[in-house]
């Protein structure tokens, strides 16, 4: 691969333990093949809150509140080689982790 290329990997998950485990797995895989890795860099957590009326009618005082937290991490693999790309393609991630890969 060209010297100026880098791979940017964005991870998203609802569980921070799961995303941290897979971020470290990607870092180990990339370092094993001789690539330089920057990250994982934690991005701001997106918190969505929902308020639902518990009462079937009229009682506005009875409400439940729920929230979902979306955790995000960014990894940059600088100067990847062919072995790095092959190793990352063979890596199987958990079902709860969303992965976006961009080659720049």
Swiss-Prot record:
One of its GO terms (molecular function) is tRNA binding. InterPro entries: Ribosomal_uS10, Ribosomal_uS10_CS, Ribosomal_uS10_dom, Ribosomal_uS10_dom_sf. The keyword Ribosomal protein applies. Gene3D superfamilies: Ribosomal protein S10 domain (3.30.70.600). Keywords: Ribonucleoprotein, Ribosomal protein. GO terms for biological process: translation. Pfam families: Ribosomal_S10. The keyword Glycosyltransferase does not apply. One of its GO terms (cellular component) is ribonucleoprotein complex. PROSITE patterns: RIBOSOMAL_S10. HAMAP family: Ribosomal_uS10. NCBIfam families: PRK00596.1, rpsJ_bact. Part of the 30S ribosomal subunit. Belongs to the universal ribosomal protein uS10 family. Involved in the binding of tRNA to the ribosomes. This is Small ribosomal subunit protein uS10. It comes from Xanthomonas oryzae pv. oryzae (strain KACC10331 / KXO85).
